[in-house]
Amino acid sequence: MGRKKIQISRILDQRNRQVTFTKRKFGLMKKAYELSVLCDCEIALIIFNSANRLFQYASTDMDRVLLKYTEYSEPHESRTNTDILETLKRRGIGLDGPELEPDEGPEEPGEKFRRLAGEGGDPALPRPRLYPAAPAMPSPDVVYGALPPPGCDPSGLGEALPAQSRPSPFRPAAPKAGPPGLVHPLFSPSHLTSKTPPPLYLPTEGRRSDLPGGLAGPRGGLNTSRSLYSGLQNPCSTATPGPPLGSFPFLPGGPPVGAEAWARRVPQPAAPPRRPPQSASSLSASLRPPGAPATFLRPSPIPCSSPGPWQSLCGLGPPCAGCPWPTAGPGRRSPGGTSPERSPGTARARGDPTSLQASSEKTQQ
């Protein structure tokens, strides 16, 4: 909060005047003490209040300071209340304004040189000057720019190109002129363009150990750049698995690289078991019921390989290609579903093993 500012004029109230005198007298002596210690000087204060009471303060010995004062005959600085009022008016500070130290207010050129000369300093020497801080550098997001990811492109290697190979749309502007004390800028414009964006993550080494020696370097760089920048270029590229490594045309001749490992990882479907070929006699024997004579043969209920609209079972229609069963014209079934009369020749032709084998060989030829 600080001390309340009061008007610098005579205090009419006796009690308030006494309290103010006690406080400010102690403050004056405290300031004299600080000045004597900091600046190594001798100070003597002689105060008479309104009741003609004497109050004195001496940094060392009052008699010695007074003796030195009476014997001093050279020109010296001497001020009164009138001089203090004129100094405050020149600085634009009223009597009721804030209390400032002499070095805190504005100074005239003459007073500045006199003060420097009194302190032993050389006015001709340059004084250090303070400049404002340099403007902050732009953030990496503004320098490199955050581009929105394009649409999904599952076509292949379109997203494998790194972002550094494309020309950057950002061009750093020329730096503004700094304060007059700085001749060169703190950072050169080339420093902004030479920086590369930090990697998103470090890829695992040794994944492609089965690559040839000639393709390990560029192929590894291609995979690294794809893993680093695939999230920025194409967010949907990771959802579609790529083809195996051996299917690329730029690999050397011979067995494709990684084909054996790919075949070991992917299980092959088992082939169905094949049945041994059977002859016509064994087929007819397997279809003959037990206890039936060799001349008896039941029509096969197995559908024909290429049935027509008028037949449903082998032996009941015209012979088809590859069918081992002989049929006779008079014994086939009519389209209407009625069974015609069978002649003895039809039963004999169907039941004769010799004719059955001959027709089977003829069909196979």
Swiss-Prot record:
DNA-binding region per Swiss-Prot/TrEMBL record: 58-86
GO MF annotations in UniProt: DNA-binding transcription activator activity, RNA polymerase II-specific; DNA-binding transcription factor activity; DNA-binding transcription factor activity, RNA polymerase II-specific; histone deacetylase binding; protein dimerization activity; RNA polymerase II cis-regulatory region sequence-specific DNA binding; sequence-specific double-stranded DNA binding
Localization, UniProt: Nucleus
Keyword Lipid biosynthesis listed: no
Region listing for Disordered, in residue ranges: 94-124, 142-309, 321-365
Alphabetically ordered keywords of this record: Activator, DNA-binding, Nucleus, Transcription, Transcription regulation
Residue spans of biased composition, Low complexity class: 277-289, 326-346
Tissue-specific expression: Expressed in skeletal and cardiac muscle and brain.
Organism: Homo sapiens (Human)
Domain MADS-box: from-to ranges: 3-57
A GO cellular component annotation in the UniProt record: cell junction
Record's compositionally biased regions (Polar residues): 223-240, 354-365
A Pfam family matched in the record: SRF-TF
Similarity remark: Belongs to the MEF2 family.
Protein's name in the database: Myocyte-specific enhancer factor 2B
